[in-house]
């Protein structure tokens, strides 16, 4: 059986902390306002794999009202979500992530993001695609107020 899931996340800029996207620290003058580390790419991907396995969403599994997830490393959240997906008998077919940001530029960091994601979801790097786009200076991402991200995941029954 093949199952597909979709995820979406958005965070505003505004915290004095590192900007983490796709498990990689991206040099920028500000970080995200978020309960965890705010990694929009990994949050969207976590939602996509949970959705594909009918396991709910990131907020159900890791509620932002629970202090144990305060400043949590999103790579750990993704790994735990993937562990639960594996328990249901699924492996990754492929994942595709689109980061929507006017700034900072993602291109120099995409290969590192792909490698970390592949490690976390136990698949080959060729099964992980990460790309970035802008909104041509339109909307909140265009005004550089934050970043949005979409992800899709294809799961295959093992």
Curated annotation (Swiss-Prot):
Residues under site feature: Transition state stabilizer: 35, 134
Cofactor: binding comment: Binds 1 divalent metal cation per subunit.
Positions bound to a divalent metal cation: 9, 11, 43
EC number(s) stated in the UniProt entry for this protein: 4.6.1.12
Keyword hit for Lyase: yes
Residues noted as binding 4-CDP-2-C-methyl-D-erythritol 2-phosphate in the record, renumbered to the chain: 9-11, 35-36, 57-59, 62-66, 133-136, 140, 143
Alphabetized Gene3D superfamilies for the sequence: 2-C-methyl-D-erythritol 2,4-cyclodiphosphate synthase
GO biological process, one term: terpenoid biosynthetic process
InterPro entries in the cross-refs: MECDP_synthase (IPR003526), MECDP_synthase_CS (IPR020555), MECDP_synthase_sf (IPR036571)
UniProt keyword annotations, A-Z: Isoprene biosynthesis, Lyase, Metal-binding
Enzyme class: lyase
Cofactor: a divalent metal cation
Pathway field: Isoprenoid biosynthesis; isopentenyl diphosphate biosynthesis via DXP pathway; isopentenyl diphosphate from 1-deoxy-D-xylulose 5-phosphate: step 4/6
One Gene Ontology MF term: 2-C-methyl-D-erythritol 2,4-cyclodiphosphate synthase activity
Keyword match Acetylation: no
Catalytic activity: 4-CDP-2-C-methyl-D-erythritol 2-phosphate = 2-C-methyl-D-erythritol 2,4-cyclic diphosphate + CMP
Physiological role: Involved in the biosynthesis of isopentenyl diphosphate (IPP) and dimethylallyl diphosphate (DMAPP), two major building blocks of isoprenoid compounds. Catalyzes the conversion of 4-diphosphocytidyl-2-C-methyl-D-erythritol 2-phosphate (CDP-ME2P) to 2-C-methyl-D-erythritol 2,4-cyclodiphosphate (ME-CPP) with a corresponding release of cytidine 5-monophosphate (CMP).
HAMAP family associated with the record: IspF
Subunit structure: Homotrimer.
Family, similarity comment: Belongs to the IspF family.
Protein name according to UniProt: 2-C-methyl-D-erythritol 2,4-cyclodiphosphate synthase
């Amino acid at each position: 059986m093949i199952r597909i899931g979709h995820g979406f996340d958005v965070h505003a800029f505004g915290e004095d902390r590192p900007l983490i996207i796709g498990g990689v620290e991206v040099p920028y003058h500000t970080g995200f306002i978020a309960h965890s580390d705010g990694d929009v790419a990994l949050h969207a991907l976590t939602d996509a794999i949970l959705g594909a396995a009918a396991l709910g969403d990131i907020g159900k599994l890791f509620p932002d009202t629970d202090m144990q997830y305060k400043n949590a490393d999103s790579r750990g959240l993704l790994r735990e979500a993937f562990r639960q997906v594996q328990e249901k008998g699924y492996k990754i077919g492929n994942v595709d992530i689109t980061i929507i940001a006017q700034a900072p530029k993602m291109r120099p960091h995409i290969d590192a993001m792909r490698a970390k994601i592949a490690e976390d979801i136990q698949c080959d790097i060729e099964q992980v695609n990460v790309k970035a786009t802008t909104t041509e200076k339109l909307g909140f991402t265009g005004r550089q107020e934050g970043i949005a991200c979409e992800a899709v995941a294809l799961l295959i029954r093992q």
